Amino acid sequence: MKTTSSKKFFKKPVFFICLSFLLLLSHGNSNEQEFSKMDIEISVKKETREAFSAPIPNLDLKKMRLFTGGRHLFRRAWVTAPGSVQSIDGLGPVFNRNSCSGCHVKDGRGKPPERGKELKSMVFKLAKIEDNSVLPDPNYGIQLNDKAILGIQYEGKIEIQYFDQEFVYQDKEIINLSKPVYKINKLSFGPLDKNTKISARVAPAVFGLGLIEAITEEDIKKHADPDDENKDGISGKYNIVLDPQSKLKVLGRFGWKASKGSLLNQIVGAAHEDMGLSSKYFPEQNCMTIQKKCADSITGGTSELTEKQIKRLLLYMQTLAVPRQRNTQDKDTRRGEELFKSIGCESCHISTFVTGKHENHEELSFKKIKPYSDFLLHDMGKNLADEVPSAEAEGNEWRTPPLWGLGLIKIVNKHTRLLHDGRAK
């Protein structure tokens, strides 16, 4: 079922007005004495390039050691098997990056490449749309891998052209969008299927994910209004996805289309598709049948990413703290917050949740948080559509991204690119 609210946002660019307000709200000096809007024990006061990389302050010593081990794995470059250090071999055969931090730089937000440059923190999903089903491309699978280990062919290369678009507000303020056009070159295994669509995705920030995991299903679902029954002009729906471990249908929370129901699935799926790392969840290599040399290449075994490593990565990503709100008592900030609410931004970017009980971390349980998201899907219109459905998300629907930490992107990641493909700036 299609939603309508975000299409209205795109045509009447409330979406970009809301982002402008959030950028204003997130600038300025910290005022910790006045800080009361989000629990201090799950947030950190940092305005450096490490602002997204700190653990929540209330971790005990044992979990802090595991967090440090997880951070080491997150930043460590994997190598081709067999390697001198077996615990980090198994890269590829085809892949996009050789480390988690290669895409999620400083645990922050990725960006599209500059003209003529290779992808660094962006990937391209593939989906063959046939008879109302979403299938892998027969030659290239569900993601295009633009790199490969020695002796193996990469799958293809991406060329991006940008066409700058200006939008002028009624007050004459100008915002810029770069409309991207994608072309896949140097395909190694023949053309894409005629029904295959491509979807560009920049890497999202990874802090605060454990807190999102701790929000109860009921608290997310209660904001859904797919048919706009309350007549406020805003509609949104939640995504229901298949959990590959339990085989049950669960609420989607993570990813640009809310296509992952848990951080575990997000981690092992990304390790397999982005880096070519097998695990007990994905024991096979990420090679399609036509890629014979890829399938026959030497591997690091069926669990190149071990269960112990997965647990450390999971704890690391669950316990990354969110940046503390800044300048909360400033007059302009307060006025910006009032405007943010009055023009309807909070209809989708809901400011406040209280987490439920987290299954593994009491430190994340029953905390007041300020993510500025409803975690629902909204129709963002044909200009932002990728035509790639994901579970119950349609091609023109995207999950509302959390806006916490927005004002620190320029400090941490040295850019201000926004949206799923980084076209807004």
For the regions a protein language model found, what residue spans apply to each?
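Periplasmic c-type cytochrome electron-transfer domains
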Residues: 25-425
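Bacterial N-terminal signal peptides
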Residues: 16-24
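Serine/proline-rich low-complexity intrinsically disordered segments, especially terminal tails, linkers
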Residues: 7-8, 22, 28
